[in-house]
């Protein structure tokens, strides 16, 4: 059964704010209502299976940290399995989005993110492409190495939601 719905992506590019580098070329991608599931299914498992089918693994289930952080050596997909939360992307000077069940955000390496508030049902499934190394950057001491590492993280071969024909491949390829 196919749970992914065709959706036009919402994209936002963030500038380096002096603490959070963000990605120098590629935008944050948000797919609204990208995943459909009914109450009889384990929504988190549906998202995990979707990510895994598209080559994004090492999945986890939790919330999003309440402090600003980013990953300098890997991209990240965040699928909302239940509830809703207000998440700021791009660092302290970034933008706030309300994410709800069925939404998926795909963050290029370097994109700052933090949860500002969430309801009690807010559950996120995170996953990563097969290339890259997980790290967590939170302070100015990480910045120098991050600025060198972020542009070296290769574009994924598959969109975590739509696979080889997904919008991510075009958006991240053409945004140079």
Give the role of each language-model region.
Residues 63-77, 92-93, 99-100:
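A short beta-loop-beta micro-motif enriched in histidine and acidic residues
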Residues 71-88, 106:
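Short, conserved beta-strand element in jelly-roll/cupin
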Residues 56-57, 63, 82-84, 92, 116-176:
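Double-stranded beta-helix
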Residues 1-69, 169-176:
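A short, N-terminal "cap"/entry segment at the start of jelly-roll beta-barrel domains
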Residues 74, 87-97, 114-115, 130-133, ...:
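A structural preference for long, well-packed, hydrophobic secondary-structure segments
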Residues 99-119, 128:
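Conserved metal-binding segment of the jelly-roll/cupin
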């Amino acid at each position: 059964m196919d749970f992914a719905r065709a959706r036009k992506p919402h994209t936002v590019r963030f500038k380096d704010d002096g603490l959070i580098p963000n990605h120098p070329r590629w935008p944050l991608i948000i797919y609204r209502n990208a995943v459909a599931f009914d109450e009889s299914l384990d929504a988190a498992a549906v998202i995990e299976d979707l990510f895994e089918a598209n080559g994004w693994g090492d999945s986890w289930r939790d919330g999003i940290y309440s402090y600003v952080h980013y990953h300098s050596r890997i991209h990240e997909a965040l699928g909302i399995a239940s509830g809703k939360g207000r998440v700021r992307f791009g660092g302290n000077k970034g933008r706030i989005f309300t994410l709800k069940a069925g939404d998926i955000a795909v963050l290029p390496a370097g994109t700052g993110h933090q949860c500002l508030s969430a309801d009690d049902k807010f559950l996120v499934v995170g996953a990563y492409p097969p290339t890259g190394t997980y790290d967590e950057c939170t302070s100015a001491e990480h910045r120098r190495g991050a600025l060198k590492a972020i542009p070296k993280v290769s574009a994924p071969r598959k969109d975590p939601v739509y696979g080889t024909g997904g919008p991510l491949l075009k958006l991240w390829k053409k945004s140079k």
